[in-house]
């Protein structure tokens, strides 16, 4: 190779080396410039996310504290900012006394209806003992557990259910068992002392569950929690649960046929009923479901009307776990919807649940009940009559 060609080759190599060094220097300069400059990597000057502002309504405010406590990320942020230095009040898990702090924490507390004052004072209380238990009720794994909300004076309703749709049966390997859910009805609520009659009833039928708490409309959510606790300890192997009121008619045979048709995947998270969407609290003080703005604001999650709903046994256990992460709410079906929301589930609407009754013209037509699962409401004698007609071998629809 000639000297001239070697010089040209060497010059080319030196030029390429210079270009490479130039590129390295330029990249280094750009990376050392202000990251917030045009075209550069943007570094936020402050936190890009802030915890939501503190709600004004008492329930929302207390629930937000609970949400942060059970969320590891939010809990860490709250502790760093000093917003949540200690755990939430967990007295509802052990010790129960009136919570006098609500008198100052809830705006205009003294002007609230008495039922709301009582609810707020005992909002955190859940540790109520069983006065009447049925520890052997689920000795044989139930296929379907019927749980009926009732009050002590409703003897006729309970007996009508026993003689109709609530009969305990054992067909093949499928067992249907029944319990009635009761609390105490003290004299201050204008109830007579019916304890002797209740004891006789319980001894005879072995289907009463009764807890040591005041049985009121606003305490139905408490009844729900106590029942789910009982399921988790005394009936954890039930495959399915129907829970409803004592003034509904239930086509138990249709429910059993439906349950037997389900796939395993469908049955796992089953929760069906007459589902209500995009509802909110009533603000009319004259209404039974009145909720003041100082207590709760916002839209309710989807929920199944409290007349009755059907769900899987495994889901009942998960629901009980969720109840510890949701403060009690005065309306029990809404509360159940809140617990489902915690589990990431939405109740499914089923046309067989008619919690607002059927058309007047169809009430006397027994064929109208063939494909129904539940209809609200019916008197005790009507329950017996409808059930008897549905069992008739001569029924043709």
UniProtKB/Swiss-Prot annotation:
Q: In its UniProt entry, what is this protein called?
A: N-acetyllactosaminide beta-1,3-N-acetylglucosaminyltransferase 2
What are the UniProt keywords, alphabetically? Glycoprotein, Glycosyltransferase, Golgi apparatus, Manganese, Membrane, Signal-anchor, Transferase, Transmembrane, Transmembrane helix
Give me the reactions it catalyses.
a beta-D-galactosyl-(1->4)-N-acetyl-beta-D-glucosaminyl derivative + UDP-N-acetyl-alpha-D-glucosamine = an N-acetyl-beta-D-glucosaminyl-(1->3)-beta-D-galactosyl-(1->4)-N-acetyl-beta-D-glucosaminyl derivative + UDP + H(+)
Q: Which residues cross the membrane?
A: 8-28
**Pathway participation:** Protein modification; protein glycosylation
InterPro entries registered for this protein in UniProt: Glyco_trans_31
Q: What is its EC number?
A: 2.4.1.149
Q: What happens when the gene is disrupted?
A: Strongly reduced number polylactosamine structures on N-glycans in immunological tissues. B-cells and T-cells proliferate show hyperproliferation. Mice also display defective accessory olfactory bulb innervation. Impaired sexual behaviour. While female mice are fertile, males show a reduced rate of reproduction. Defects cannot be attributed to any physical defect in their reproductive organs, suggesting that the phenotype observed may result from an impaired sexual response to female mating partners.
MF terms per GO, please?
N-acetyllactosaminide beta-1,3-N-acetylglucosaminyltransferase activity
What quaternary structure, including any partners, is listed in this protein's UniProt entry? Interacts with B3GNT8; this interaction greatly increases B3GNT2 catalytic activity, independently of B3GNT8 enzymatic activity.
Topology Lumenal: residue spans: 29-325
Family assignment from sequence similarity: Belongs to the glycosyltransferase 31 family.
Swiss-Prot/TrEMBL GO biological process terms:
axon guidance; cellular response to leukemia inhibitory factor; poly-N-acetyllactosamine biosynthetic process; protein glycosylation; sensory perception of smell
Residues carrying sugar: 30, 79, 89, 127, 173, 219
